[in-house]
Amino acid sequence: MSASASACDCLVGVPTGPTLASTCGGSAFMLFMGLLEVFIRSQCDLEDPCGRASSRFRSEPDYEYDFIVIGGGSAGSVVASRLSEVPQWKVLLIEAGGDEPVGAQIPSMFLNFIGSDIDYRYNTEPEPMACLSSMEQRCYWPRGKVLGGTSVLNGMMYVRGNREDYDDWAADGNPGWAYNDVLPFFKKSEDNLDLDEVGTEYHAKGGLLPVGKFPYNPPLSYAILKAGEELGFSVHDLNGQNSTGFMIAQMTARNGIRYSSARAFLRPARMRNNLHILLNTTATKILIHPHTKNVLGVEVSDQFGSTRKILVKKEVVLSAGAVNSPHILLLSGVGPKDELQQVNVRTVHNLPGVGKNLHNHVTYFTNFFIDDADTAPLNWATAMEYLLFRDGLMSGTGISDVTAKLATRYADSPERPDLQLYFGGYLASCARTGQVGELLSNNSRSIQIFPAVLNPRSRGFIGLRSADPLEPPRIVANYLTHEQDVKTLVEGIKFVIRLSQTTPLKQYGMRLDKTVVKGCEAHAFGSDAYWECAVRQNTGPENHQAGSCKMGPSHDPMAVVNHELRVHGIRGLRVMDTSIMPKVSSGNTHAPAVMIAEKGAYLLKRAWGAKVURVDATWTLHRVI
């Protein structure tokens, strides 16, 4: 901490993470973005020097803990917070990154930190049928390397998926994971700020995670809703009874400020002496007895390359995400025996499904123009509106909080949407001068609509490059290798073109950008063959990776964990993140990740004799037993 006192009645820390100027592109942005960051860091609710969990940070861990949680991201922050509610349990949270930077708290900056030092910046192996226009045909996968994980980088959209997603999990041999079983755990975390609008049947107040709409939306957002209505869709809460339609989504934010899992769950736990947090420390291996298969502890490496072993009394929880959870299991000798032998990792337990079943939502960036000058949404006027009132364009994500879900002709039923629409535009993220009306180009303003496949059939895998734990994993996404994914995506493109031709959007002069995609010149523009070519050239992976530590019964050869999230064949090890999803939920995955963590922590508490609450679907965890 620095020696300078702040108006927040406690010491202001040294700046954490990348600066806003650096995330915008460097020197041309230095003056305005640098000044803006100074103003932002003077705001107590943004910098939050008194509320950060820094009192829990440890440079030296203890010798032994009751529970060790690997990964302080979307799920791991929740697990560590919930376990530390039991004062008799000593809990260690291990995070490879540092604390979240202040700039990431601002909703309009949500894309700025992708590609920065708090991003793992993963790339897939060369893809045979997707990302063909990218360098070496590799798809880019941003993943948060920071306390809070990808919940520091994501678009904050709170989408749970469809009822049928979870009913299918249960039907596949995972009792306790049907929709009515998991709804209480969605509600447990939720502090819904719009309860009068969305109702109490599916939502709740009083949880640690604020969920509500941004203070401001551009007028175009409401025009998009009217466009959806013109095509016969209703506007309503897609997290309620009906998951088909349009909405301005609720977000994990309060008063125009992002709430990552770290901010929502760890900062309220900052006074608990039984919670320790190791930052800038990578878990390199889970220590497992080769004969008894009991977990003994965790091996870690700090930012200076020093390694140590930390022992565990009860259990290790792996919450490193759909990329790093299987990676750590493989490094620990848990995985397909033949693949481990190829990289000289000693097999502790042959578990063929580790790293398999990897899948992700996939999209295509459809570009449109509207009759509006291409000026920077960020300027001193919008900055002051945010700094003084937490309102205006910086308090939201432009039109990116609008979304829609619909069923194409390839959907299992009309009530089960297989396509989600995302929107992009009016994002107040970067500016050079701060002047009102600063031109970005001489063109009309661009608007993007992204149709995303919700039920992808294509499957990839995570593997090891070597036995070196600090070498990135091998990621094979296999996007668009199943033809139905391509067909569904093309249906989505044709729908968004229809949407752009509705009366509400025609009033903005919305028109399709007809620039021919390089590599698709041989096809007639707008034909199905053209769009099939285009989606393979300019593939847009979402950041919703899942499935690589699949939950399933022991007779499923590809299952990694059971319905209690215990790793098959290993004692004292569970996985709690989106990697356990048998099939990815139909929508953004942050809300389901938090739900998985809430349910997982409940299962741990129940297994180890802590007082827990009876669960039912009416809400919720209401009686101590």
From Swiss-Prot:
Any one GO molecular-function label of the UniProt entry: flavin adenine dinucleotide binding
Protein's name according to its UniProt entry: Glucose dehydrogenase [FAD, quinone]
InterPro entries, per database record: FAD/NAD-bd_sf, GMC_OxRdtase, GMC_OxRdtase_N, GMC_OxRtase_C
PROSITE patterns named in the record: GMC_OXRED_1, GMC_OXRED_2
Binding site for FAD: 66-95
Enzyme Commission number(s) of this protein: 1.1.5.9
Predominant location category: secreted
Cofactor(s) recorded in Swiss-Prot or TrEMBL: FAD
Family per similarity comment: Belongs to the GMC oxidoreductase family.
GO cellular component, one term: extracellular region
Catalyzed reactions: a quinone + D-glucose = D-glucono-1,5-lactone + a quinol
Active site: H544
Function summary: Essential for cuticular modification during development.
Keyword Oxidoreductase applies: yes
Cellular compartments annotated: Secreted
Leader sequence residues: 1-42
Keywords recorded for this protein, A-Z: FAD, Flavoprotein, Oxidoreductase, Secreted, Selenocysteine, Signal
Organism this protein belongs to: Drosophila melanogaster (Fruit fly)
SUPFAM superfamilies on file: FAD-linked reductases, C-terminal domain, FAD/NAD(P)-binding domain
Pfam family, one: GMC_oxred_N
GO biological process: glucose metabolic process; pupal chitin-based cuticle development; sperm storage
